[in-house]
């Protein structure tokens, strides 16, 4: 799959609660299918909402960085290089491949009834929030798109 373009817009949302897993120091989804919030935590959550024809819609949630919980809905216009038999199998393939690629890149991830949930903890350094060395949270757009392109290049 080749992602030809993407755009984002914001909306206020409530997002799934995440909890630090003390055993391995990674972020763990404690309720991937429910919608709860935990005060004072900073994290990203991505959902693969749906795929319609050649449009892949991702929902990227950002909590704790801005005054309100903002969601950036990323509409990716996709060109699938190979035909997948039906819509359901295509979505399953995208979710499966993206899950593995995000895990390989060091993100926390889980697959639940609401699709793919991907997260990364944020830390504040010198007044800026950083994720894996990316100072501006909005720069994660290109990182996410690169990961998705890699994960779906055989689809």
Which stretches of residues belong to each language-model region?
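Charge-rich, low-complexity N-terminal segments
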Residues: 1-59, 66
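Short glycine-rich, low-complexity/disordered patches
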Residues: 19-37, 102-124, 146-155
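Acidic metal-coordinating catalytic centers involved in nucleic-acid phosphodiester chemistry
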Residues: 1-12, 132, 140-154
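Intrinsically disordered, low-complexity regulatory segments enriched in Ser/Thr/Pro
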Residues: 47-132
